[in-house]
């Protein structure tokens, strides 16, 4: 008798093969939206960098530095915390959500593909926003190598939180409401483009726990010299939010049948 060949569906080779397949699938599935995503990212980041300057008759140097170094963070936030939930909500509205989970790849591969695409997608808008902001305020920023882990940490945290929340919330309408709330809070009540000392104590204390201030500070530390203190604490805040988001994501993935 001839032994039947069986396909090994475990191990690093199978996982990496599924990861490459999901990357291709997701890129093809989102190809019509990627340019739109980038446009929104640039408009929110570079657009706010320009608009904030109109709040001053003459922008003081420190204020200009905060705006120019905070604007790139504003370009990162919408990718992870608005566009990722919107993409997941679209799957649910179009009744392809269950199909996504039925694909013959490990479920964590589906999450890893999304994390990779949206984290990388944050980079072009970040760069464009930084260039526009530096031009608008005529600044010579002290860009250092630490900007690389800063952008990756901030982007991964935002994508992780957006992905975990979007999958954990069953009703896409609620997801859409929360997305709009996040944008409202980030634009009006987050110390991203100005010092946290401008806030009352209770709101400043809240933002020391929320991720937005820490996102801005790790990015700002990679663009300036001596403006950010206690950088390790800010990375710890981002790491805590990322781990919590991954825990939620693992729970969501694990309970799918």
Language-model regions, residue ranges each:
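Transmembrane helix-loop junction
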Residues: 53, 57, 90, 134, ...
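Transmembrane helix-boundary elements of multi-pass transport/secretion proteins
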Residues: 10-15, 25-92, 142-147, 177, ...
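Small-residue-enriched core segments of transmembrane alpha-helices in multipass membrane transport
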Residues: 68-77, 148-161, 181-188
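Transmembrane alpha-helix boundary and packing residues in multipass membrane permease domains
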Residues: 49-54, 130-134, 163, 167, ...
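Short hydrophobic, aromatic-rich alpha-helical segments embedded in or entering the lipid bilayer
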Residues: 2-3, 8-24, 192-235
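Hydrophobic alpha-helical transmembrane segments of multi-pass membrane transport proteins
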Residues: 47, 51, 64-136
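Transmembrane helix segments
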Residues: 56, 168-209, 213
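Alpha-helical transmembrane segments and their short interhelical loops
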Residues: 107-108, 112-179, 227-247
């Amino acid at each position: 008798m001839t032994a039947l060949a069986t396909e090994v569906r475990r191990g690093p080779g199978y996982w990496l093969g599924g990861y490459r397949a999901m990357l291709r699938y997701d890129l093809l599935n989102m190809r019509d939206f990627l340019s739109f995503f980038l446009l929104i990212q640039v408009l929110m980041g570079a657009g706010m960098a320009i608009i904030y300057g109109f709040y001053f008759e003459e922008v003081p140097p420190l204020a200009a530095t905060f705006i120019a170094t905070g604007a790139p963070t504003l370009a990162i936030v919408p990718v992870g915390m608005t566009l990722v939930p919107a993409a997941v909500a679209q799957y649910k509205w179009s009744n392809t959500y269950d199909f996504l989970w039925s694909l013959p790849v490990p479920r964590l591969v589906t999450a890893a593909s999304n994390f990779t695409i949206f984290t990388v997608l944050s980079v072009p808008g970040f760069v464009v926003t930084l260039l526009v902001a530096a031009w608008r305020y005529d600044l010579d920023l002290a860009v250092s190598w630490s900007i690389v882990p800063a952008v990756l940490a901030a982007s991964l945290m935002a994508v992780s939180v957006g992905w975990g929340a979007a999958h954990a919330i069953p009703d896409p309408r609620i997801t859409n409401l929360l997305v709009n709330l996040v944008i409202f809070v980030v634009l009006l009540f987050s110390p991203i483009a100005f010092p946290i000392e401008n806030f009352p104590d209770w709101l400043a204390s809240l933002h020391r726990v929320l991720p937005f201030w820490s996102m801005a500070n790790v990015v700002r530390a990679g663009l300036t010299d001596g403006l950010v203190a206690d950088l390790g604490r800010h990375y710890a805040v981002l790491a805590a939010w990322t781990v919590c988001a991954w825990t939620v994501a693992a729970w969501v993935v694990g309970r799918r049948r």
